[in-house]
Amino acid sequence: MRHRNSGRQLSRNSAHRKATLQNMTASLFRHEVIKTTLPKAKELRRVAEPLITLAKVDNVHKRRVAFARLRDKEMVGKLFQELGPRYQTRPGGYMRILKCGNRPGDNAPMAFVELVDRPELTEEAPAVESAKEE
């Protein structure tokens, strides 16, 4: 019986599952949007959102706790310098999971995971001068 056993196994043993979620969390913080399967996305939310909440207050202890969970020095820096201050006034719900159809090979449900309130990359089109203006 699996009474009171929360979380998903994701067809992995505990060490593999922990490493997978650590890597996915670091990738999410690095790129701010990733594509993965729906069960992994839902499980990722349980790992990544508490880290962002932790990063709202920057001190040495919280950085060490975040490093123990992420094991990526660069992403811990980004978490506390960029993501923590960005979500200072938001009381949770830092991620959005958008379903995006099924994977062609095995028909697994896929999803985009993105951080809300992320700065949009606006590439301005190069100014095209028309021939009439000349």
Curated annotation (Swiss-Prot):
InterPro entries: Ribosomal_bL17 (IPR000456), Ribosomal_bL17_CS (IPR047859), Ribosomal_bL17_sf (IPR036373)
Any single Pfam family the record assigns to this protein: Ribosomal_L17
GO cellular component terms given for this protein: cytosolic large ribosomal subunit
Record's keyword annotation contains Translocase: no
PROSITE patterns: RIBOSOMAL_L17 (PS01167)
Keyword Cytoplasm among UniProt keywords: no
Alphabetically ordered keywords of this record: Ribonucleoprotein, Ribosomal protein
Origin superkingdom: Bacteria
Record SUPFAM superfamilies: Prokaryotic ribosomal protein L17
GO BP terms, alphabetized: translation
One annotated GO molecular function: structural constituent of ribosome
Subunit: Part of the 50S ribosomal subunit. Contacts protein L32.
Family designation: Belongs to the bacterial ribosomal protein bL17 family.
This protein's name: Large ribosomal subunit protein bL17
Lineage per the UniProt record: Bacteria, Pseudomonadati, Pseudomonadota, Gammaproteobacteria, Chromatiales
